[in-house]
Amino acid sequence: MVIFSTLTLTEADHAAIADALSTLESKLSALISVSADQRRSLNKMGEKSETFCRRTLVAMSENPGLIPADVDVAEAQRDMAQFDALRPHIARLTKLLGRAEDSEMALGSDAMV
């Protein structure tokens, strides 16, 4: 069964893609890598905890006198702002990566026919 007939990328296309990836790597150089152990130990923000976190940040900013001095509300707000800003980029990259992997699989499958 042929799923994918052709994908034609020129040398110029490959060069432009490599340049674009280099730009992304440069602009996203502050992204971190975590080990499997670190990943397991991190708190994960799911849908319910995200709502709770957002509401808590609002409550903390509205009631600064109730917050312990060692809690940096401004830093938490900056983290949430960066979380929000990064999310749409991750969604686009994830979708693009999925399409690239599907195309790679289809090309390999077609080549085996």
Name every feature range the model reports, one short phrase each.
Residues M1-V113:
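Basic/polar low-complexity intrinsically disordered segments
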